[in-house]
C-alpha cells in the first residue's frame, strides 16, 4: 500500500521533529518528552520529541527506587487494543529502516518452518531483558538497569549514539566495549535485513511481542469478508511476514495480502 509508506515516513519525521537537535547535538527535554510514541524510537535521538515506550517501561524498573509503570503499561494496552501490530507495520521508524534495506537488490530468504519457530525469542527477550534482569540487578545491587536498552536495542545506536558521536567529538573517546557490542549487533541486524524481511521485528523486538498479544483482539487491522473469500491462500503465499493465518501474532497489517487478493475479500480498517 502506497499510503502505508507515506504514513511510515510521516511517523518517523513526527517522532524526530526536533531538527535543531541534529545540528546542536542536544537531546530535547521539553514537556512532550513525557509522552510515549507508539513505535520504537530512541529517547536519546537528538531529534526525538517523545519517549520510547520500551525505555520508559525499563526506567520505571531501574534506578534506586522502583515505580510500577502504570502509565506506560496503560498506554501499551490502549495502543494494543486499538491497533495491535498495525503499529509495527505503519508507525515504527526502525521497521521502516528494515523495509528500505530489504528493497536492495540482494537474494531474499524465506524462513524455513524450523527458523520460524524461533520467533518466540522476542517473548523470551521481553521477559528476560525488560523485567527479570532490571529487577535482578535492583535486588542484587540496589539499583536496576534498563537491560534491553543497554545491551540489545539497535535503535539506540542508530538513532542516538552514532548521530551524537558524529556531532560531538568529545563523546567518542568514552565509547567502550558495550558500544562496540551494540554496534556489531546493529550491523548484523541491518545486514540481515537486506535478505530477510524485518528480522528484528520477527525475532527480537519486545514492542512487537507486546502488541502481538492484542493482534486478534484489536479494533483496527486486517479483516476478511468470508463471503468473498475463495480459499486460494494467495494472501498467505505473498505475506512478507510469512503468517500462517491472516491477523495472527506475526501479522503487521501491512496490507500486502489485500493487494493480491483476487476477490478483494481482504481490507484494512475497523474489524
Model-predicted segments: where are they?
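Non-ligating segments of multi-cofactor redox enzymes
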Residues: 1-242, 249-250, 255-271
Amino acid at each position: 500500500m502506497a499510503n502505508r509508506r507515506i504514513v511510515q515516513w510521516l511517523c518517523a519525521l513526527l517522532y524526530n521533529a526536533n531538527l535543531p537537535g541534529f545540528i546542536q547535538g542536544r537531546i530535547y527535554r521539553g514537556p512532550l518528552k513525557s509522552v510515549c510514541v507508539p513505535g520504537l524510537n530512541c529517547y536519546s535521538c537528538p531529534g526525538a520529541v517523545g519517549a520510547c515506550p520500551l525505555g520508559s517501561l525499563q526506567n520505571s524498573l531501574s534506578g534506586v527506587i522502583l515505580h510500577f509503570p502504570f502509565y506506560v503499561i496503560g498506554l501499551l494496552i490502549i495502543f494494543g487494543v486499538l491497533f495491535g501490530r498495525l503499529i509495527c507495520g505503519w508507525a515504527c521508524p526502525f521497521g521502516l529502516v528494515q523495509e528500505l534495506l530489504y528493497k536492495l537488490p540482494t537474494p531474499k530468504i524465506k524462513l524455513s518452518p524450523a527458523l520460524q519457530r524461533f520467533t518466540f525469542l522476542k517473548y523470551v527477550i521481553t521477559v528476560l531483558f525488560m523485567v527479570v534482569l532490571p529487577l535482578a540487578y535492583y535486588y542484587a545491587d540496589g539499583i536496576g538497569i534498563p537491560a534491553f536498552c543497554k545491551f540489545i536495542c539497535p535503535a539506540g545506536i542508530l538513532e542516538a549514539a552514532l548521530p551524537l558521536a558524529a556531532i560531538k567529538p568529545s563523546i567518542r573517546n568514552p565509547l567502550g566495549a558495550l558500544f562496540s557490542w551494540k554496534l556489531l549487533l546493529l550491523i548484523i541486524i541491518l545486514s540481515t535485513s537486506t535478505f530477510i524481511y524485518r528480522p528484528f521485528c520477527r525475532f527480537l523486538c519486545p514492542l512487537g511481542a507486546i502488541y502481538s498479544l492484542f493482534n486478534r483482539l484489536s479494533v483496527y487491522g486486517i479483516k476478511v469478508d468470508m463471503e468473498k473469500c475463495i480459499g486460494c491462500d494467495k494472501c498467505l503465499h505473498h505475506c512478507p511476514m510469512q503468517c500462517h493465518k491472516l491477523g495472527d501474532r506475526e501479522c503487521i497489517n501491512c496490507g500486502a495480502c489485500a493487494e493480491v487478493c483476487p476477490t478483494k475479500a481482504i481490507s484494512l480498517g475497523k474489524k
